[in-house]
Amino acid sequence: MSVIKCNPTSPGRRHVVKLVNGGLYKGKPYSSLLSKKVANSSKGRNNYGRITMRHIGSGHKQRYRIIDFKRNKDDVFAVVERMEYDPNRSANIALIVYKDGERRYILAPRNLNVGNKIISGLNVPISPGNSLPLSNIPVGSIIHNVEMKVGKGGQLARSAGTYVQIVSRDGEYIILRLRSGEIRKVRCECRATIGEVGNNEHMLRALGKAGASRWRGIRPTVRGTAMNPIDHPHGGGEGKNFGKHPVSPWGVQTKGKRTRSNKRTDKFILCRRKKK
C-alpha cells in the first residue's frame, strides 16, 4: 500500500492524501454475502423521522457485507480468494473459500495474502488469520477480533491497525491489554484471530474537502457557541465566551465525564483506559 499526496491542481485536491492498494479486487462484491438492507439507509433518524444521531445524512448508498466474526467452522481449511474494500469499516476484508465450496468474508489481517490457507479450530497453528480459543494462544501473542462472550463473535480490535495483546492467564480468565491501555479479563473459551488487523495506514489519509465527508454520510458539525440560546447551552451572548463548563446540547458535561453505565462487568476491567 502506498500513500499519495495529491498535487494542488484545485482547492479540493490541495490537502488530499490518498491510500492506494493495488492488491484489492476491483469488481463487485460477492452477492450472496450482501445484506438486503442498505447499510446507511436510516440517515440518523428513527421510525418517527426524528434525529437520533446528529451529523449523519445523505452519502453514497452502501451495501452491508456480512462478515464472519464467529469463525466457527472448525478444522476445515480455507483459501483466501481475494481482498476487497469495505465501505462500512476502516479495515479491508478477505473473501475465503472453504474446501466444501462455502464462501465467507472475514477481516483481513496484516500479512495475509491471496492464496494463503487459514483454518479455525481448537488446536491450530499460530499464524495470521487462524482462529482459536484464547486458552490455546501463547502469552504475548498479538490477536484481533476477540470475543467478549463465548460464541457471540468477535467484538474487540476490529478497526484498521488495531490489536490486543495477551498479558497473562488467571485461572479461567485471560488478561488482555487493549490499544487504549485498558487491561481486562476475558473467559479462556472465547475465540480470537491471530495477528493485527490490516490497513494500518488508514490513519494517514486526509479527505481534503467537505464534499468527501458528505460522500461518506457525514454532515457538518456546528459549534454550540455559534448557535442561539434556544438551540444549545453555549449559544447566545456577546463574544465567543459562553461562561460555563462545556456541555452537550442536552446539558451533560462533555469533557472528562464518565459515561459507562454497565456496573455489572466492572469486575472484568483491571485497569481503565488511559486518558487522551
Swiss-Prot record:
Pfam families (alphabetical): Ribosomal_L2 (PF00181), Ribosomal_L2_C (PF03947)
Gene3D superfamilies, per the entry: 2.30.30.30, Nucleic acid-binding proteins, Ribosomal protein L2, domain 3
Protein keywords: Ribonucleoprotein, Ribosomal protein, RNA-binding, rRNA-binding
Organism in which the protein naturally occurs: Blochmanniella floridana
Entry's Gene Ontology BP terms: cytoplasmic translation
Function per UniProt: One of the primary rRNA binding proteins. Required for association of the 30S and 50S subunits to form the 70S ribosome, for tRNA binding and peptide bond formation. It has been suggested to have peptidyltransferase activity; this is somewhat controversial. Makes several contacts with the 16S rRNA in the 70S ribosome.
Annotated protein name in UniProt: Large ribosomal subunit protein uL2
Keyword Mitochondrion in record: no
Transmembrane residue ranges: none
PROSITE patterns xref list: RIBOSOMAL_L2 (PS00467)
Subunit structure, as described in the record: Part of the 50S ribosomal subunit. Forms a bridge to the 30S subunit in the 70S ribosome.
Organism ancestry: Bacteria, Pseudomonadati, Pseudomonadota, Gammaproteobacteria, Enterobacterales
Any Gene Ontology CC annotation: large ribosomal subunit
Location of region: Disordered: 224-265
SMART domains: Ribosomal_L2, Ribosomal_L2_C
Coiled coil regions, renumbered to chain: none
InterPro entries reported for this sequence: NA-bd_OB-fold (IPR012340), Rib_uL2_dom2 (IPR014722), Ribosomal_uL2 (IPR002171), Ribosomal_uL2_bac/org-type (IPR005880), Ribosomal_uL2_C (IPR022669), Ribosomal_uL2_CS (IPR022671), Ribosomal_uL2_dom3 (IPR014726), Ribosomal_uL2_RNA-bd_dom (IPR022666)
PANTHER family per record: LARGE RIBOSOMAL SUBUNIT PROTEIN UL2M, RIBOSOMAL PROTEIN L2
Family: Belongs to the universal ribosomal protein uL2 family.
GO molecular function: rRNA binding; structural constituent of ribosome; transferase activity
